[in-house]
From Swiss-Prot:
Belongs to the FPG family. Monomer. This is Formamidopyrimidine-DNA glycosylase. One of its GO terms (biological process) is base-excision repair. SMART domains: Fapy_DNA_glyco, H2TH. NCBIfam families: fpg, PRK01103.1. The active site is at residues 2-3, 57, 259.
Length: 269
């Protein structure tokens, strides 16, 4: 599933092609996604794109009459293509632009979403989200406060969108390794100093991945069709049995809440 860096990489890739251009119309070939494509999207006509934003893993296209909310689901991608390029099997939604280009949504598993809202504030998919990890609101003091009474392992707690958004499975594993914190540690056992370090490395890991265009393990592609290159820099994720790049100890894989967790028994305590 695309996580925050992948979604942010796509946002940065599509923004220059959309802002200042006008959506002439939408083409919905298959509206049966995780939730049905909103009826308002079918009727889009002559709508200039004012901004392309991101909240958590949602892309937000600002139009004069409202907002398009896009979620990529498990296997979705967005690409900027020439309008004349014919669609393929899993190309479900196009936004045809005034500049001769098309924003094309591809999703083999159809678990993404295209929603419409007049106002973002209070929308049910956005209403209960925690702070952005790259914002000043997410810091060691905040993390320590939220962990203080939490009797659960730190790894799944980091992946809870009510604590902080966008730190999915890959980046939770990578950040805990960078901070030297074992994923099974109770959240409440973390000191303020550990929380300050963890908050810093989460930001650093996410920013580095964004610079590399995200992580491609299977389906993810950037808006130009290229893979994300952060996969080349993964320290623990997906490396079960391989030697730790720091100490040489074999990387261990376990599961938390049915999600794979990777760590080094020597480097993480």
């Amino acid at each position: 599933m695309p996580e925050l860096p992948e979604v942010e990489a796509i946002r940065r890739g599509i923004e220059p092609h959309l802002v200042g251009a006008t959506i002439l119309h939408a083409v919905v070939r298959n509206g049966r996604l995780r939730w049905p494509v909103s009826e308002e999207i079918y009727r889009l006509s002559d709508q200039p794109v004012l901004s392309v934003q991101r909240r958590a893993k949602y892309l937000l296209l600002e139009l004069p009459e409202g907002w398009i909310i896009i979620h990529l689901g498990m296997s979705g991608s967005l690409r900027i293509l020439p309008e004349e390029l014919p669609p393929e099997k899993h190309d479900h939604v196009d936004l045809v632009m005034s500049n001769g280009k098309v924003l094309r949504y591809t999703d083999p598993r159809r678990f993404g979403a295209w929603l419409w809202t007049k106002e973002l504030e209070g929308h049910n998919v956005l209403a209960h989200l925690g702070p952005e990890p790259l914002s000043d609101d997410f810091n060691g003091e905040y993390l320590h406060q939220k962990c203080a009474k939490k009797k659960t392992a730190i790894k799944p707690w980091l992946m809870d969108n009510k604590l902080v958004v966008g730190v999915g499975n890959i980046y939770a594993s990578e950040s805990l390794f960078a901070a030297g914190i074992h994923p099974d540690r109770l959240a409440s056992s973390l000191s303020l100093a550990e929380c300050e370090l963890l908050a810093r490395v989460i930001k650093a890991v996410l920013l580095r991945s964004i610079e590399q265009g995200g992580t491609t393990l299977k389906d993810f592609l950037q808006s130009d069709g290229k893979p994300g290159y952060f996969a080349q820099e993964l320290q623990v994720y997906g490396r079960k049995g391989e030697p730790c790049r720091v100490c040489g100890t074999p990387i261990v894989a376990t599961k938390h809440a049915q999600r794979a967790t990777f760590y080094c028994r020597q480097c993480q305590k």
